[in-house]
């Protein structure tokens, strides 16, 4: 059983961030009916469903129905967002059985706008969501990248939530169900780059990804579907995982010898080998 299944409900985004992989795939969004079909096939195979690989989930017009479908299948729904559309979707999120919301605050700096207005909107909505029982995580995953505004962002968070933060490794607890996570900027795996010291990864161990056309991929970083394992609309998940390619990936990591060229070029997977 997986811990996480990343289901891309849309590959369309309202921003253009320099840290994002982007895609040449055809712009597409799943219908609520298509998504329901997917989660029915994931039922019993994962604990959490993340509505993201690429794209901005809050642009989806059927977001409420999608989140409800996850809960109806006995799984927990998680969303990663750039935060710009939180105000417009506040009631939908409050009404939904949403387990966790992660907001990429580092998306703001590369897109511009009124920082205080953005942060106030994000913090107001997250405060209400946390009071409603949803875990809210603010992300600053830009260490070593575009981080000139981090000081202003941290200052705003302290002013809004107070400064009595509890530190734990690279994260801080700002209040009940409210967290701040710092991390280094990472590079998406690129088949054109050189190989890295990759020996192990959690792909196909604790997670799997489903792109918005139904293509199953080993993890949330295969944004172009470079390692297609099958299609969830055409095959059961068991059949996909029983494919020769999927088994080679799993056993390759077990033997510390990744079978896929893209995996051997993944900076994130390299962290498991350091």
Positions of PLM-derived features:
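Conserved alpha-helical substructure of the radical SAM core
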Residues: 1-101, 111-116, 120
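Structural recognition of alpha->loop->beta junctions
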Residues: 43-44, 90-110, 152-176
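Short loop/turn microsegments at loop-to-beta-strand junctions
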Residues: 204-206
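C-terminal accessory region of radical SAM enzymes
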Residues: 128-136, 159-196, 221-271
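Short cysteine clusters
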Residues: 13, 17-20, 201, 219-220, ...
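Conserved strand-turn element in the central/C-terminal portion of the radical SAM core barrel
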Residues: 108, 125-156
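Short, acidic, Ser/Thr-enriched surface-loop or helix-capping motifs
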Residues: 210-211
């Amino acid at each position: 059983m997986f811990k996480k299944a990343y289901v891309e409900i849309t590959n369309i985004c309202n921003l253009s961030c320099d840290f994002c992989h982007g895609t040449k795939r055809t712009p597409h969004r799943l219908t609520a009916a298509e998504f329901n079909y997917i989660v029915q096939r994931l039922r019993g195979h994962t604990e959490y469903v993340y509505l993201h690989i690429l794209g901005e989930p809050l642009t989806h017009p059927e977001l409420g129905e999608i989140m409800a479908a996850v809960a109806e299948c006995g799984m927990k729904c998680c969303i990663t967002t750039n935060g710009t559309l939180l105000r417009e979707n506040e009631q939908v999120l409050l009404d939904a059985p949403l387990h966790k919301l992660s907001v990429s605050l580092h998306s703001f700096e590369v897109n511009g706008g009124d920082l205080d207005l953005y942060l106030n909107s994000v913090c107001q909505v997250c405060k209400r969501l946390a009071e409603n029982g949803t875990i809210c995580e603010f992300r600053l995953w830009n260490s070593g990248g575009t981080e000139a505004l981090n000081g202003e962002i941290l200052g705003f968070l302290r002013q809004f939530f107070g400064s009595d933060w509890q530190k734990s490794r690279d994260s801080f607890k700002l209040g009940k169900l409210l967290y701040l996570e710092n991390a280094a900027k990472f590079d998406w795996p690129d088949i054109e780059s050189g190989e890295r010291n990759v020996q192990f990864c959690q792909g196909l161990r604790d997670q799997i990804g489903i792109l918005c056309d139904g293509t199953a991929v080993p993890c949330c970083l295969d944004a172009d579907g470079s390692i297609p394992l099958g299609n969830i609309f055409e095959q059961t998940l068991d059949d996909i995982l029983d494919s020769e390619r999927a088994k080679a990936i799993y056993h390759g990591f077990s033997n510390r010898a990744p079978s896929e060229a893209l995996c051997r070029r993944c900076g994130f997977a390299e962290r498991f080998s350091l």
